[in-house]
Regions:
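Hydrophobic core residues within well-ordered beta-strands of beta-rich domains
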Residues: 60-62, 81, 114, 164
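Sec-dependent bacterial lipoprotein signal peptides
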Residues: 1-23
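Bacterial Sec signal peptide processing site at the extreme N-terminus
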Residues: 20-40
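Terminal connector regions
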Residues: 122-189
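Short acidic, flexible loop segments centered on an aromatic residue
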Residues: 73-93
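Short, solvent-exposed beta-strand/turn "edge" segments of beta-rich domains on protein surfaces
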Residues: 46-61, 69-77, 107-110, 157
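Intrinsically disordered, low-complexity Pro/Gly/Ser/Thr-rich segments with frequent PxxP/GP/PP motifs
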Residues: 91-142
Length: 189
């Protein structure tokens, strides 16, 4: 009977020890893991076609270049990322145009940064309708016409004379165990 009790106590001690070891952090210095960082470095015009009036459809291809940094000693895996692209129509007034999503796994070693380029295509025939449907009242209140705003964006994108904003950004790392939000704008002020 005493022997069974000793065995029972040993089993419980082993289970408790295993549970505590399993809860230890993976960081070498005993610290907790820090979330990775996602920062917009720049926006590039990847492909440009001169604006043409409707019913012509003119694509505008933009590349959003991000710096994804891992402040930890152990590698992390970026598995999914999405964000909303907005253009500035008047100072401080941005309108959402697209939400690109990336489903590519990218490993970032500890204490390093990787560059991620996300390419998205905007359509000059779709953008005015998008503005009218999603932000029609706001566009009218600002005294703007969707078609004119889109024409100006297409004609001035090369100089980035208006702001481009990424918002509602979410990056998912390590099988959704780490979720990082981000937003930023370009050109940098």
């Amino acid at each position: 009977m005493l022997r069974m009790r000793v065995q029972g106590v040993l089993v419980v001690l082993c289970l408790v020890t295993l549970a505590l070891v399993g809860c230890a952090t993976m960081q070498g210095a005993g610290g907790t893991a820090q979330p990775p960082q996602v920062k917009l470095e720049r926006v590039e015009v990847a492909s440009y076609f001169p604006y043409a009036a409707p019913p012509a459809r003119v694509p505008l291809v933009l590349a959003f270049v991000y710096k994804v940094s891992n402040p930890n000693d152990t590698p992390v895996a970026l598995e999914e990322m999405k964000f909303t692209v907005s253009f500035e129509a008047k100072p401080g007034e941005f309108f959402a145009l697209n939400t690109p999503t990336v489903y590519e796994t990218m490993y970032i070693p500890g204490k390093t940064s990787n560059e991620l380029r996300v390419t998205t295509v905007l359509d000059s025939l779709i953008a005015p309708g998008n503005l009218a449907v999603t932000s029609g009242q706001r566009v009218l209140a600002l005294g703007l016409k969707p078609g004119d705003v889109v024409k100006e964006w297409w004609e001035k994108i090369g100089d980035f004379s208006f702001g481009v904003k990424v918002s509602e950004g979410v990056a998912i790392f390590n099988g959704a165990s780490v979720i990082v939000s981000f937003e930023d704008s370009f050109p940098k002020k």
